[in-house]
């Protein structure tokens, strides 16, 4: 609908209104409602067209081409994934062929010596000062209980460069047997795992060891059951 047509319709409506001024009150009310409806429809149509073709509308924030909004968490994850860690870390496992003794190896699958950590004389050598998570697990296995008390110990020790004395950092003791297996009774198998872990301030050159008192009871059935490691924090 053009502007001229809209003006013409308004003039005709005014003329009709003047001619019927002396008419009934009901006729006047109908005419007013008709005019109101006409202008309402015309205005709504015009507004729809302006919005549809983008003449008016909400403002949009413009960003340079190729720029994307990334949340702080996403930025952190993305940057951390691109940064390779250079912190010392080690994970060694027991030598399965060394029956009767606990010897650590880093040549099996899923073992690791990274960023200057060394394995020397069955000890892990710390390459730099700092906080370290030290952890170790051993698994004991036996058949029946002897007449004497059976105590199993697992100890993680440190020999510091500042003082050449072995100091226990973590130590645990367990007794798998509460009483002796009666004579003639079936000797049932038992299993006793011991896991230890803690965070310690270490110095470059410190030596760490993980030892037990009764290696004959170690369970070497599966690789990875007995392990020792450190992680720089």
Swiss-Prot record:
InterPro entries, A to Z: TNF, TNF_alpha, TNF_CS, TNF_dom, Tumour_necrosis_fac-like_dom
Lipid-modified residues, N6-myristoyl lysine kind: 19
A Gene Ontology BP annotation from the UniProt entry: negative regulation of blood vessel endothelial cell migration
One protein family per Pfam: TNF
Primary site of residence: membrane
UniProt entry keywords in alphabetical sequence: Cell membrane, Cytokine, Disulfide bond, Glycoprotein, Lipoprotein, Membrane, Myristate, Phosphoprotein, Secreted, Signal-anchor, Transmembrane, Transmembrane helix
Occurrences of domain THD (ranges): 88-233
Glycosylation sites: 80, 95
Annotated compartments: Cell membrane
Membrane topology of the entry: Single-pass type II membrane protein
Membrane-traversing stretches: 36-56
Modified residues (Phosphoserine): 2
Post-translational modification: The soluble form derives from the membrane form by proteolytic processing. The membrane-bound form is further proteolytically processed by SPPL2A or SPPL2B through regulated intramembrane proteolysis producing TNF intracellular domains (ICD1 and ICD2) released in the cytosol and TNF C-domain 1 and C-domain 2 secreted into the extracellular space.
Keyword Metal-binding belongs to the record: no
One GO CC annotation: membrane raft
Disulfide bond sites: 145-177
Site annotation Cleavage: residues: 34-35, 49-52, 77-78
Glycoprotein found in the keyword field: yes
Residues on Cytoplasmic side: 1-35
Coiled-coil residue spans: none
Homology family: Belongs to the tumor necrosis factor family.
Subunit comment: Homotrimer. Interacts with SPPL2B.
Summary of the function given for this chain in its UniProt record: Cytokine that binds to TNFRSF1A/TNFR1 and TNFRSF1B/TNFBR. It is mainly secreted by macrophages and can induce cell death of certain tumor cell lines. It is potent pyrogen causing fever by direct action or by stimulation of interleukin-1 secretion and is implicated in the induction of cachexia, Under certain conditions it can stimulate cell proliferation and induce cell differentiation. Induces insulin resistance in adipocytes via inhibition of insulin-induced IRS1 tyrosine phosphorylation and insulin-induced glucose uptake. The TNF intracellular domain (ICD) form induces IL12 production in dendritic cells.
Protein's name according to its UniProt entry: Tumor necrosis factor
Organism whose genome encodes this protein: Delphinapterus leucas
């Amino acid at each position: 609908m053009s502007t001229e047509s809209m003006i013409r319709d308004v003039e005709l409506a005014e003329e009709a209104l003047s001619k019927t001024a002396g008419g009934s009150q009901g006729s006047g009310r109908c005419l007013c409602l008709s005019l109101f409806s006409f202008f309402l429809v015309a205005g709504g149509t015009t507004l729809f067209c302006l919005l549809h073709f983008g003449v008016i509308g909400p403002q949009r924030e413009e960003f340079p081409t190729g720029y994307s909004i990334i949340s702080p968490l996403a930025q952190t994850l993305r940057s951390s994934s691109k940064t390779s860690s250079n912190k010392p870390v080690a994970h060694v496992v027991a030598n399965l062929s060394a029956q009767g003794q606990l010897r650590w190896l880093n040549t099996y699958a899923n073992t690791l010596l990274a960023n200057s950590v060394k394995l020397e004389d069955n000890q892990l050598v710390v390459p730099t000062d700092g906080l370290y998570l030290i952890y170790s697990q051993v698994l004991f296995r036996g058949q029946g209980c002897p007449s004497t008390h059976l105590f199993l110990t697992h100890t993680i020790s440190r020999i510091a460069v500042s003082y050449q004395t072995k100091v226990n950092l973590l130590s645990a003791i367990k007794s798998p047997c509460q009483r002796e297996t009666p004579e003639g009774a079936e000797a049932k198998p038992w299993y006793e795992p011991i896991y230890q872990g803690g965070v310690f301030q270490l110095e470059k050159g410190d030596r760490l060891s993980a030892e037990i008192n009764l290696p004959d009871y170690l369970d070497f059935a599966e690789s990875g059951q007995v392990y020792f490691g450190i992680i720089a924090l």
